[in-house]
Amino acid sequence: MVKAVLTDIEGTTTPISFVKDVLFPYSYEKIQEFVLKNKDNPQIVKILEDVKKIEERELSLEEIIQTLKKWIEEDRKITPLKELQGLIWEEGYKSGELKGYVYPDAYEKLKEWYEKGIKLYIYSSGSVKAQKLLFSNTNFGDLNYLFSGYFDTNIGNKKDPLSYTKIAQSVGLNPNEILFLSDNPDEILASA
């Protein structure tokens, strides 16, 4: 029996086009200004250091920014990039430049499951911060009340079966009690 639903966002609750055509270009356009403005913020300093570790070499601030832009172009699922994008999107949502979009049928089904007492969770390659931002500013208003928890790349890759085991342990359920929704067959196979 299904006791929880774990859903992806991009292509599942929200059009792929929203992420690819709205969020990614927004972060690409704003990343240089954001990093330069916040380069002394401890959270940003850590993200910049993480980029250097991943690249395994010393990089100037400009080289780090160019690396981050390249990762956006390549749609890389790398934690420091996702964390930085979440911070950039937060500014966009707060300023009103960004507003999330949820498919009407996805909203209706999530609401129905919530009302039936089925726990709802998000698992996305976007940071938890970005997930909460998207669902707090949607075409249906703030939907974060629907969700009992959020997972991102910190728990593991969505194509790694171990990630789903960790999520099940984290929410106190057996993996066979969790329905995973995604538009990606490789992720569905990993969750099985």
Mark where each language-model region is.
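Short, well-ordered beta-to-alpha junction loops that form the rim of enzyme active sites
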Residues: I9, Y123-S127, D183
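Conserved SAM-binding loop
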Residues: L120, F180-L181
